[in-house]
Amino acid sequence: MDFAANAYLQTYRTPYKYGAPVLAGSGKPGSFDALAVDAPFVFFHNGQFHMTYIGFDGEGYQTALATSGDLLHWERKGVILSRKTPGAWDSIGAAGVWIILEDNELDTLPRLKKIDGKYWMVYHSYPQTGYEAGPAEIGLAWTEDETLMNWTRLEQPVFSWKDGADWEKGGLYKSCVVTHNNRYYMFYNAKTEGEPWLEQTGAAFSEDLLHWERCPRNPLLPVSPGCWDSIFVSDPWVVHSGNQWLNFYYGFDGRHAQDGLAVSEDLLHWQKCEGPLLSHGQAGELDGTHAHKACVLRHNGVLYHFYCAVRPWQEGDATNCGGEFRCITVAASAPFQ
């Protein structure tokens, strides 16, 4: 499937890059985002846009909330999933990456769904200190607080690599949960054991969010040897548009991580589109190394593609994470005003 020959897929291109961070880490020692921010999740709630995102401080991830009136200028509200006391499975940190939505239509603003009077967030946690250190598991948190600042986590993970197949024995990463035909579908990427490892994307099903059954066809989106996604097929962002399901994922070939697109009619059989949908930038640009970890929505007819941009650290950057500057930025289908 070639983007240049397929007018349908052209509608998901966002060639106009903002070129500056919409959110960057604080760089303040001791702050949850001292070294980097990552993994945007944008939705509309109580009359304004909200973004959950994760910050890294050298020890682990914590999740924070920001709000905006225009999708470009964001006000930080504070940490909503923080580090726990030692002993808990998620004591190192909690990377909140998805809150269950009313629907998954790309052409309507994403709004949160209440289930039994609660909003539900999916997060993952790594067992060791450091950057994504050790095999992560997936948990759930809930809130009845309309400010979305106060969350309660379930005591145990709801999904683990421990009972998974070989392709996921190295641990789990980002998940997203969509509802279809009164069933929950959780898409997630996982890695193989050892180094170097592969990351691929699979799915699991549930009736209650607590008990999950893996798809026997996993991984549904494997790596493609020799291609731009030959090592990682990661961080699914699944939405519905027209009569198709879309998965905005990122691929990695050992040098650059870039966002791509896969298409499905039934959530089980996926066809990858050829080449990246959102490519990394030129050397020195904000996303000169990586343009990855998509969050995609449409507002006032414009498609917004939020992502994590990475390039080598430069003098004056707010943060330095292992010699890299990692921030959240956005690209759009129309020029920014």
Regions found by a protein language model. Name each.
Residues A64-L71, A136-E146, Q200-L209, G260-L267, ...:
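Beta-propeller blade signature
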Residues Q258-D259, K272:
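Short conserved catalytic/interaction loops centered on acidic-Pro-aromatic/His motifs
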Residues E285, G316-C321:
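Short proline/glycine-enriched turn/loop segments at secondary-structure junctions
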